[in-house]
Amino acid sequence: VEHTVTELITGHNLVELGIRVAQGEALPLKQEDITWRGHSIQCRLNAEDPREFVPSPGRLWECHFPSGFGIRCDTHAHPGYEMPGCFDSLLAKLLVWGRDREDAIRRMKTALDETMITGVEHLIPLHRRIMDEEDFNNGDITIQYIDMHQELLG
């Protein structure tokens, strides 16, 4: 699980805690201090062809990422950014938090619809199709999910 997902459902900044421990501080909480609340989903918004997962280099002409309650977007992207064809194709990590899985899926659909990226191909259409897919909605997913649902690739 990505640290960002864990942070949204526990309320603890894991990176900050890791840095503090690395500096010699004692961990300021115990396992029993950690409670889980709600459900979180993260979509990696990569500059890639959503059918073949090959990089899509180019200039971002426009980009807008949603914000608000239950939404977190970690990004370095901005209009004019030159997405290289090598290295990591990640443009943003889009996360949502909801009271339960159904609420989180609903919020992610809205967040994906409110995200705008032009100038490069990206994975938003794939993520949107996944959010509508029955097995995903039912939580029936494995590491072979995409292999088992090739129709999602477009």
Regions found by a protein language model. Give the residues of each.
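ATP-dependent carboxylate activation and anion-phosphoryl transfer catalytic cores
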Residues: 1-154
